[in-house]
Amino acid sequence: MKKIKWILILGLLPLLMPVLVILILASAMAGGSIGGNSSVQKGVTYSEHWSNGDAYTHNLLVHRYGIKASQLDGFLKTLGINYDSSRINGEKLLEWEAKSNLDIRAILAIALNESSLGTAGVATNPGANMFGYGAFDSNPENANNFNDEVAVVALTQQTIIGNKNQTFKIQDDKAKKLASGTLNTTVDGGVSFTDTSGSGKRRAETMQKLDTYIDENGGTPKAPKQTAGKTRDGGGITSSDIPEGYSLT
């Protein structure tokens, strides 16, 4: 009888897999709602500006479509920081966004507020990262074990998704709960930072400044609408890959 039960369970696995995948994706996006103006392309969710009305409550796994490296470089130069442009620049930020699935505006905001774009604190050590990943209050030098690229991917998977920190507001709220002794890490997940002075709010303000700069310097096209069943002949692009207002000719 037990053998028959196992055969039945194994036979049902292929049918259950799609449901499990949907549940996993839904869990990853939990903690920050996504507005009705969102679009999904190749597994990446886009919103015109913010997923939930403003940068502070924005889901950090939702992106603004079509941001250019030149726009990012232009914004970085307005900050008045003598940063290493070979270490952080528009092209690298775009690469980090693609590898981590973290909103590029959040990546820049975290780097700025954690280490002034890698120019302050432990981030100046050889091999350390500019995002504060691994820099525990009790052992900040631990950040030396994670370079920038490794850190931004791990930060997204562990800190943002695994510990349910999908918005900067959630991160601020959890830091306050930790300080007051009311944080239930089993339910709420761990904190992104322990500072209670409004670190999340400041990061959101940086995101908003970058978003405004982009608007004032060329803007971005609207994300392509989600399509079902499209095909690619010979690996080329299709008309559904082209942003609104653009064409293949």
Q: Predicted regions span which residues?
A:
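His-Asp-centered metal-binding catalytic motifs of divalent-metal-dependent phosphohydrolases/nucleases
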Residues: 111-115
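Intrinsically disordered, compositionally biased low-complexity regions
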Residues: 26-30
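SH3/SH3-like beta-barrel superfamily modules
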Residues: 249
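Catalytic cores of secreted/periplasmic lytic hydrolases that degrade extracellular macromolecules
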Residues: 14-18, 22-23, 34-106, 117-243
